[in-house]
Amino acid sequence: MESKEYRKLEYNYKAFLIFSKVAMLTFLTVGIGAIFTPQTYPIMPTIGFIVVAGIVSLIGMTIGALIIHQQYETLPANEKLEFKQKLLPEAYYICIELFGYGSLVLLYNTFTSNNPTLCVMSLLMAGLFILVVLVIWYFGYKSY
């Protein structure tokens, strides 16, 4: 029988996954939109949207992960093991997938845009996303 704490953690975990998907898909939509931005349109609002969407995604996912980790620490040992085996690999896979797609879109922006400012910003964000993927893979997904 699962405890009340475990059910609460599972509920928050699923909400975290939904938030993560929505945040990253929003970021990807803005990034893909930047690809098709006409040359006559001022590029700074597009860059601002990309940066804000990326930062909001990272901050939201970090806060969610910290809340889930705090709740995870209050579980008994048998429920911790069940959570790790049942739910955690899915989160690592989703984060790797979304950040991986994000870095691909940003790299595409880098090499197809005629605007040097967008190229530099896209390259920096792609580098950050690739770093996040490597950290998640090394510390999390690899351990399973």
Curated annotation (Swiss-Prot):
GO CC term (a single one): plasma membrane
Lineage top rank: taxon: Archaea
Keywords, alphabetical: Cell membrane, Membrane, Plasmid, Transmembrane, Transmembrane helix
Transmembrane parts of this sequence: 16-36, 48-68, 87-107, 120-140
UniProt topology in membrane: Multi-pass membrane protein
Compartments, as annotated in UniProt: Cell membrane
Annotated protein name in UniProt: Uncharacterized protein MJECS05
Classification of source organism: Archaea, Methanobacteriati, Methanobacteriota, Methanomada group, Methanococci
